[in-house]
């Protein structure tokens, strides 16, 4: 898994991601999962229409870039992209890239939060693809995205449909201005939800 800090320089973020993906492959990883919306900073902390310019089609520039890297390294990659489906319709989409660089499948985030610092409903339309696992050379992946983890039926549907492992690209964090005790309670609750899957 690659989880890294990102800045406003998207090309620099992508180069850093590619370097970290290479490190994972050098250590023997056959499957590498990137964090939610990994090409940029997590922009959903603000409602700003101009940020919709970050969206891209799938297939598109990111699937081409990461597809070439997956093929070069012989790994399966799970991406998390800001998808422009058509004018005015955007999704938070996980894309699975197979070892040959092709798109094995994608999943559009179904459960969209609208909480302080997570104003995703401003940007994303809920997914419309159901809970269909994606067949890959490393197994059948039940790919969901971040907030979906709080809805157990998503994991249940993926498992019932044949998923061998569940994957959640995630950008969720804590409120670091909260007291340390409260941060621990929140972290423990999140971990308990994950174990419940």
Each predicted region: which residue ranges?
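Active-site-proximal loop/turn and secondary-structure-junction residues that shape catalytic pockets
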Residues: 38-39, 83, 111-113, 171-173
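Short, glycine/charged-enriched secondary-structure capping and boundary segments
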Residues: 14-15, 46-49, 92-93, 110, ...
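Short, acidic/polar
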Residues: 12-23, 151-157
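CN hydrolase (nitrilase-like) catalytic-core segments centered on the catalytic cysteine
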Residues: 55-78, 140, 146-197
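Active-site beta-strand/loop signature of hydrolases that rely on acidic residues for catalysis
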Residues: 13, 24-50, 70, 77-78, ...
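Short beta-strand segments enriched in small/hydrophobic residues
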Residues: 1-7
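Catalytic-core segment of enzymes that process non-peptidic bonds
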Residues: 53-143, 195-196
């Amino acid at each position: 898994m690659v989880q890294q800090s990102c800045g406003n320089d998207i090309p620099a973020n992508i180069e850093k991601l590619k370097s970290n993906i290479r490190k994972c492959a050098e250590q023997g990883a056959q499957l590498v999962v990137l964090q939610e919306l990994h090409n940029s900073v997590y922009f959903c902390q603000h409602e700003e229409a101009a940020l919709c310019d970050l969206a891209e089609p799938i297939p598109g520039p990111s699937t081409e870039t990461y597809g070439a890297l997956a093929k070069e390294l012989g790994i399966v990659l799970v991406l998390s992209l800001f998808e422009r489906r058509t004018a005015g319709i955007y999704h938070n989409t996980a894309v699975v890239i197979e070892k040959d660089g092709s798109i094995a499948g994608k999943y559009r985030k179904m459960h969209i939060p609208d909480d302080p610092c997570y104003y995703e409903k401003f940007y994303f339309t809920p997914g419309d693809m159901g809970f269909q696992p994606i067949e890959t050379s490393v197994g059948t992946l039940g790919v969901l995205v971040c907030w979906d983890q709080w809805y157990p039926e998503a994991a249940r549907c993926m498992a019932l449909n044949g998923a061998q492992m569940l994957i959640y690209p995630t950008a969720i964090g804590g409120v670091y201005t909260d007291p340390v005790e409260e941060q621990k309670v929140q972290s423990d609750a999140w971990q308990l939800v994950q174990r419940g899957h």
